[in-house]
Amino acid sequence: MPFGHTFDRLGSVKYFTWDDAKNEKLKADRGIGFEEIVFLIGQGHVLDILEHPNQQRYGGQRIFVIQRDNYVYLVPFVEDDRLIALKTIIASRKATKQYLEREPDDHET
């Protein structure tokens, strides 16, 4: 079911969609749902967009890297001319370390 929208680089409207049953399961199991992901995207909390590393199995999928508070979530998605279909939400300790826990510079004390 589409919820919310965003604009691509050319100004075209894109609608978000997802599986409602999957969304309810994510909220129950992980404490976060697709509605919040769409809100965070709209608020500029996208740290990166990656190609899915397993294109053979998940061809065409990309991954939003989203910051929520002090943690990073990976959100696989597929996109066409008018829809962005969100697939799941994965809390990632590895991505949190990579994107949010920067190494201090040598000149910092």
Regions found by a protein language model. Name each.
Residues 1-109:
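Ribonuclease/tRNase effector modules and their secretory precursors
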